[in-house]
Amino acid sequence: MPNSPQNPSRKALYTEEERARRDATPWTLVQAILAPLQFLAFGVSLVLVVRFLFTGEGYEAATISILIKTLLLYTIMVTGAIWEKVVFGQYLFAPAFFWEDVFSFGVIALHTAYLWALFTGQPDNMQMFIALAAYATYVINAGQFLWKLRQARLQAASEDAGTLVMERGTR
């Protein structure tokens, strides 16, 4: 467990002050709403893109779904940067989320490449394969953030258990 008596060598994901700021800011709720919405848009869009690639039908629906997914991605990136500023004091690349932010830029680059392909009239299949590449990187990036969420929960449980042990020890 991070920064616990059992494993003091692991750095905590949040300091007490950062955790308090994280819990107090409305941007945490914004992220908590946008992340599942983006995942839902991803799931629907993935089905539509694969359907188009297999059948050649549904290009418009797949395109609209990719645009919605991309808009959600850009929105969550901007609001996430604001969240990082509030919690960690910098807009991006806070040490606790450095690699997630680095990989996020790859995800954004591929989604932006899709927009380029769409707006410059590249072949439909090329557009869809770029979208699939963007989605593959998104899945990896989402996994990174889910891992951090798990670490944060374990840290909170560890700190709560430590507080409980300290309280019981003082009685």
Swiss-Prot record:
Query: GO:BP terms for this protein?
Result: bacteriochlorophyll biosynthetic process; light-independent bacteriochlorophyll biosynthetic process; photosynthesis, dark reaction
Per UniProt, the enzyme's principal EC class comes to lyase
Q: What is its EC number?
A: 4.2.1.-
Sorted UniProt keywords: Bacteriochlorophyll biosynthesis, Chlorophyll biosynthesis, Lyase, Photosynthesis
The name this protein goes by in its record: 2-vinyl bacteriochlorophyllide hydratase
What's the domain of life for this entry?
Bacteria
Report the Pfam families cross-referenced here: BCHF (PF07284)
UniProt KW Zinc keyword:
no
A Gene Ontology molecular function term for this protein is: hydro-lyase activity
State the organism of origin.
Rhodobacter capsulatus (strain ATCC BAA-309 / NBRC 16581 / SB1003)
